[in-house]
A protein has these predicted regions:
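Beta-rich carbohydrate-recognition and catalytic domains
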Residues: 1-150, 155-203
């Protein structure tokens, strides 16, 4: 985009393609905006997390991509949407959906969605060695492994962490599922917190 055509009040990437905002947060004295990003061409590609910071939400400085799809558990398309939160030790935790392309019993390949984490200092981020930290294997037995994404993380009053994600059962009915963690790295399934019944769907 030429300087004359670039939006003033909307964040745009320096190059490439962008989509969903992710992990919007205030950390270490600045606003952090991450976003779905493919830096190599101006259209969809393996998803990265772009990263920009601002003091006033108007003037943005671009930082290196916070996440890039460089692990086997992201080989099905990249590092997809998620959120961010401060840890007790001062680091920032990114929680995101990693997509794994996996061979199924019938021989076909299918993208399996799972949740991963990375930690950093506001500029550089390192993925956790025990990723993925939340998988569909932890969900109820009727859960669809291919629709389990978009983690939203927050800190509970007792200092532990909660994370809610979207999922659906094997019939395709949507629901939200809740996980909990004491440290942000080891997660356990807690409950289904919302179920979208067929009669509640509005066309």
């Amino acid at each position: 985009i030429t300087p004359q055509m670039r939006p003033v009040f909307h964040l745009t990437p320096r190059v490439g393609w962008m989509n969903d905002p992710n992990g919007f947060s205030y950390y270490n004295g600045a606003y952090h905006m991450f976003y779905q990003y493919y830096p190599y061409r101006p259209f969809w590609g393996p998803m990265h997390w772009g990263h920009a910071v601002s003091k006033d939400l108007l003037h943005w400085n671009y930082l290196p991509a916070a996440l890039a799809p460089d692990e086997p558990y992201e080989n099905g398309g990249g590092c997809f949407s998620g959120s961010a939160i401060d840890l007790a030790d001062g680091r920032q935790l990114l929680v995101y959906t990693g997509v794994l392309s996996e061979k199924q019993p019938d021989g076909t390949m299918h993208d399996v969605q799972q949740q991963c984490v990375a930690v950093g200092d506001g500029v550089n981020y390192e993925k956790c060695e025990n990723n993925p930290v939340m998988t569909a294997k932890q969900l109820p037995s009727d859960s669809n492994r291919f629709d389990f994404r978009d983690p939203k993380v927050w800190k509970a009053a007792d200092g532990s962490y909660r994370c809610v994600m979207v999922n659906c059962d094997n019939k395709g009915d949507g629901r939200a599922v809740l996980f909990e963690s004491k440290d942000g790295f080891s997660w356990n399934f807690k409950a289904e917190v919302a179920v979208l019944l067929e009669e509640a769907v509005v066309d």
